[in-house]
Amino acid sequence: MTLKQRYQQAGKEASWALSLSILYVIGWCLCAYLPKETQGPIGFPLWFELSCIYLPILFIVIGHWIIKIIFQDISLEINDQGNQK
């Protein structure tokens, strides 16, 4: 992988990480402030269950799959073939 390809991959990974972070904050705000004051299935207020239990679990799963699909192992060695330019 050339140095240019490494930078492109790093930029792609950073974009995904930033997008997921922004999406998480938006999801947390929606889950915390939109539900009515009702009790959730496990006994906590619904807003708490959605924003502090279910949403983090969902994003852990999403993050795991993004790491498996999008992210790549990149060698940190500069002496790789094609990096001399």
Curated annotation (Swiss-Prot):
Cell membrane listed as a keyword: yes
Family to which this protein belongs: To E.coli YhdT.
Keywords: Cell membrane, Membrane, Transmembrane, Transmembrane helix
Matches recorded under PANTHER family: INNER MEMBRANE PROTEIN, INNER MEMBRANE PROTEIN-RELATED
Main location: membrane
Name the record gives this protein: Uncharacterized protein HI_0974.1
Organism: Haemophilus influenzae (strain ATCC 51907 / DSM 11121 / KW20 / Rd)
This protein's GO CC annotations: plasma membrane
Chain ranges passing through the membrane: 16-34, 50-71
Locations listed in the record: Cell membrane
Membrane topology, from the record: Multi-pass membrane protein
Organism domain of life: Bacteria
Keyword presence, Transmembrane helix: yes
